[in-house]
Swiss-Prot record:
Keywords: Cytoplasm, Hydrolase, Nucleotide metabolism. It comes from the Bacteria. The keyword Manganese does not apply. Its EC number is 3.6.1.-. Its main location: cytoplasm. It comes from Bordetella pertussis (strain Tohama I / ATCC BAA-589 / NCTC 13251). Belongs to the Maf family. YceF subfamily. Nucleoside triphosphate pyrophosphatase that hydrolyzes 7-methyl-GTP (m(7)GTP). May have a dual role in cell division arrest and in preventing the incorporation of modified nucleotides into cellular nucleic acids. InterPro entries: ITPase-like_fam, Maf-like. This is 7-methyl-GTP pyrophosphatase.
Length: 199
């Protein structure tokens, strides 16, 4: 009798991450983690993303024993400085003016845990923004309202028009859930997207 694969949970309220995970065709549920996302003093952006991805996964795993839980977090940086979520039009406009013609690093961190063992990964994506006019910035912001997105640009939709180039080992990392790395990690927990059975 084949082993029953463990229940899979995505520790996220992001619809983009849910859409990405559904590409792997593994049944899962999504649960919003209750985690304080405040950076620690002097914490490097990459360390913050990794710490939060682990915290999100562990918070959900603590109340769902026997499940495999995926936590993720993404931090964008320019010149090593973090770029947060803008929260509104004016701040988003300022961000995009600052990013115009520049390179931005996106750290897409992930943690997969069963509550006992934890695997982590940080996939870096380098995005170079086009030189943007104020008219282009305003048109984009009115069309997309990307106020909940670090860097004010949603590469999974119209925000791709702001980009000059994107370099990464994983094309889904920029959207917030690196599926190539995730597939590898899930295999270590007995979940294989191709067979639906233990890897």
């Amino acid at each position: 009798m084949p082993a029953i694969p463990p229940k899979l949970i995505l520790a996220s309220s992001s619809r983009y991450r849910r859409e990405l995970l559904s590409r792997l065709r593994l049944p899962f549920t999504a649960i919003s983690p209750d985690v304080d996302e405040t950076p620690q003093p002097g914490e490097a952006p990459a360390d913050l993303a990794l710490r939060l991805s682990v915290a999100k996964a562990m918070a959900v795993a603590a109340t769902h024993p026997g499940s495999v839980v995926i936590g993720s977090d993404q931090v964008a940086t320019v010149d090593g400085e973090p770029i947060g979520k803008p929260g509104g039009f004016e701040r988003a406009r300022e961000q995009l003016r600052r990013l115009s013609g520049r390179a931005v690093e996106f750290h897409s961190a992930m943690a997969v845990t069963d509550g006992v063992h934890t695997e982590t990964a940080d996939i870096v994506t380098l995005c170079r923004f086009r030189t943007l006019t104020d008219a282009a910035i305003d048109a984009y912001l009115r069309a997309e309202e990307p106020y909940d997105t670090a860097g004010s640009a949603k590469a999974e939709s119209l925000g791709i028009a702001l980009m000059d180039s994107i370099r990464s080992d994983d094309p889904t990392a920029i959207i917030g859930l690196p599926l190539i790395a995730l597939t590898r990690m899930l295999g270590r927990f007995g979940l294989d997207p191709l067979t639906g059975h233990p890897a």
